[in-house]
């Protein structure tokens, strides 16, 4: 989410969007190495915990960098049932720098409230205009604060390198810039799961992330990068939502909806389709945002004035509506939650196997995970 941004998409831009979204993804090769077990990591195109249990994010964004005195919001969000909080930080390029000690304290609050912390640098929003900083500069920030209790925090923290890098210009540079930033963090010894946002203000209408995700994933020596799409006005139909998310899931690439709302100045996102499709596919989603929005998008607040007892219509929808957080969130097993198979549901009503064919030794399409039968996606049993 950008601060009071203009999200006008030109006719030419939409033409590129159509072309980009037609590109087929070449998924990661079956023989590639993936991140070694330990901490949140990617396995068979899914986000899992260190013990191999599937973890599907169901959470909320919190604008910490603009409201550093509202850290109680993490507890309030957790109390509503979220299993993840995406926390807005600043590298100092556009707003006051979030210090290493603040990062450490935020991780501590997430752990105390039994939620996974997705930490993101917001200064990169729309790089190329508005004074936004580069992904390379965001990488420098992460390297600089990695002493902030990073050791042994891989079970609890996902590092979202930079929010919505690249706006609607020069976005072709996203692929190389993202690969370079991943390399910088890995070279500095960060072993956490990484999250990378799409260009085009996070909405990837050009199909840049969709077309290049496989090569970006392969560039990570840990094979531990999760892709994040932000769904606002570009995703105003169920078909667009399903098409985008299925492109990643079908090609074994990890995807989450890192931001979305129920309305926006650039169009009317189909939040019902976003939540239903995410639930069906076992894909994580993080709604924007708890409170404190301005610049004409105050309707994206889930609660009024940071008061957890004063829900807005958007807050009620995402928390308690169909496929909402309260009904679908599962606490991470590292906190004692039950976990469970969350790879989505097959047409026959059985869950899909999170570990794919590895759970099906006899090759009949049926596997066994979490003490129950599961279906291997695309097998003869997938009907």
From Swiss-Prot:
UniProt temperature dependence: Optimum temperature is 58 degrees Celsius.
Taxonomic superkingdom: Bacteria
Single GO BP term: polysaccharide catabolic process
GO molecular function: cellulose binding; mannan endo-1,4-beta-mannosidase activity
Signal peptide region: 1-35
Domain CBM10: 339-377
Keywords: Glycosidase, Hydrolase, Signal
SUBUNIT field: Monomer.
Family per record: Belongs to the glycosyl hydrolase 5 (cellulase A) family.
Protein name: Mannan endo-1,4-beta-mannosidase
Species: Streptomyces lividans
């Amino acid at each position: 989410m950008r601060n009071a941004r203009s999200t006008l998409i030109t006719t030419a831009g939409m033409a590129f969007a159509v072309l980009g979204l037609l590109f087929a993804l070449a998924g990661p090769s079956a023989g590639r190495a993936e991140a070694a077990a330990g901490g949140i990591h990617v396995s068979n195109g899914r986000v899992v915990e260190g013990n191999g249990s599937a973890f599907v994010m169901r959470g909320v964004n919190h604008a910490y960098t603009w409201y550093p005195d509202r850290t109680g919001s993490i507890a309030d969000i957790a109390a509503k049932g979220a299993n993840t909080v995406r926390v807005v930080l600043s590298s100092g390029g556009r707003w006051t720098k979030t210090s290493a000690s603040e990062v450490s304290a935020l991780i501590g609050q997430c752990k105390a409230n039994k939620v996974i912390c997705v930490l993101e640098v917001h200064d990169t929003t729309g790089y190329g205009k508005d004074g936004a900083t580069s992904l390379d500069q965001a990488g420098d920030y992460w390297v600089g604060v990695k002493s902030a209790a990073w050791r042994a925090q891989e079970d609890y923290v996902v590092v979202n390198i930079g929010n919505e890098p690249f706006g609607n210009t020069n976005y072709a540079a996203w692929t190389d810039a993202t690969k370079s930033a991943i390399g910088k963090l890995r070279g500095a010894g960060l072993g956490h799961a990484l999250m990378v946002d799409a260009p085009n203000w996070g909405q990837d209408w050009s199909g840049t992330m969709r077309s290049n995700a496989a090569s970006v994933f392969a560039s990570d020596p840990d094979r531990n990068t999760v892709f994040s799409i932000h769904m606002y006005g570009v995703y105003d139909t169920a078909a667009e939502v399903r098409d985008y998310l299925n492109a990643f899931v079908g090609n074994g690439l990890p995807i989450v909806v890192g931001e979305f709302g129920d309305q926006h100045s650039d169009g009317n996102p189909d939040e019902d389709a976003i939540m239903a499709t995410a639930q069906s596919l076992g894909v994580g989603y993080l709604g924007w945002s708890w409170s404190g929005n301005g610049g004409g998008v105050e309707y994206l607040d889930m609660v009024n004035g940071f008061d957890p007892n004063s829900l807005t219509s958007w807050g009620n929808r995402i928390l308690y509506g169909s496929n909402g957080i309260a009904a679908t969130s599962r606490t991470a097993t590292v906190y004692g939650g039950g976990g469970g198979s969350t790879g989505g549901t097959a047409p026959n009503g059985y869950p899909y196997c999170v570990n794919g064919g590895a759970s099906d030794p006899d090759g009949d399409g049926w596997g066994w995970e979490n003490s129950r039968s599961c279906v291997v996606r695309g097998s003869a049993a997938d009907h």
